[in-house]
Amino acid sequence: MGLGEASARGTSMEGDCLSCIKYLMFVFNFLIFLGGSFLLGVGVWVVVDPTGFREIVAANPLLFTGVYIILAMGGMLFLLGFLGCCGAIRENKCLLLFFFMLILIIFLAELAAAILAFIFREHLTREYFTKELKKHYQGYNNTDVFTSTWNAIMNTFDCCGVNSPEDFEESIFRIINPSEMVPEACCRRNNHVGESGFSNREECLSGSMLYRNNKGCYSAVVDYFEMYIYVAGALAIVVLTIELFAMVFAMCLFRGIQ
């Protein structure tokens, strides 16, 4: 076998490898494109949802900000996936370099956000919701979205307060209702007793632990959604992995293009 034949075979193998990287990069970027489209769809649905979820989100600044963060991330991933697909198919070095720099910035930002969210998840979340409950929960004002949402949560999950019934101490609820230790939504229900369904409403409102729900809603909701939280965490790891591979493929393709 001559040197020319060996060189030609090496060039052919290099070309095949480059083509493989190009199509792998296209596949990974198409997945990023689909992920961005999904986040955009979820964000738009929450913003325009006519069933009332829009009002709940609008009433809570944290949720309101979160929806627009989802929209922004969805838009960036949508654009990122599109640029990556175009750069791979067209073998455009400028597009590939721009794609690499953009996805590197997003990757580092997502990684930092995930680490911070994991480190501060419990302390900040409990602290925030407890503070908001004390400031805004009114008890029986069902025209107030914040109050009606909390009533629905406490009735659905048979819980009381964020951490415990003691969260209502020194709250606006106690100022409005000084004779009640906890709101009616905290009272235990028994559908076989009377029309109201309460085991003993009066004893509950006066503070008796026997007739109220003593578990905090934070723990109750986290326990209920525990599986979904792990799924969300797994999806975040998958997204970060896809982005990492996309960066590697982009740089390999960039270096391989003559």
From Swiss-Prot:
Keywords: Glycoprotein, Membrane, Transmembrane, Transmembrane helix. It is a multi-pass membrane protein. GO terms for biological process: regulation of angiogenesis; regulation of sprouting angiogenesis. Gene3D superfamilies: Tetraspanin. GO terms for cellular component: plasma membrane. Residues 47-61, 116-228 are extracellular. Glycans are attached at N141. The chain crosses the membrane at residues 26-46, 62-82, 95-115, 229-249. Residues 1-25, 83-94, 250-258 are cytoplasmic. The keyword Membrane applies. Pfam families: Tetraspanin (PF00335). It is found in: Membrane. PANTHER family: TETRASPANIN (PTHR19282:SF504). May regulate angiogenesis through KDR/VEGFR2 and NOTCH1 pathways. Belongs to the tetraspanin (TM4SF) family. This is Tetraspanin-18B. It comes from Danio rerio (Zebrafish). The lineage of its organism: Eukaryota, Metazoa, Chordata, Craniata, Vertebrata.
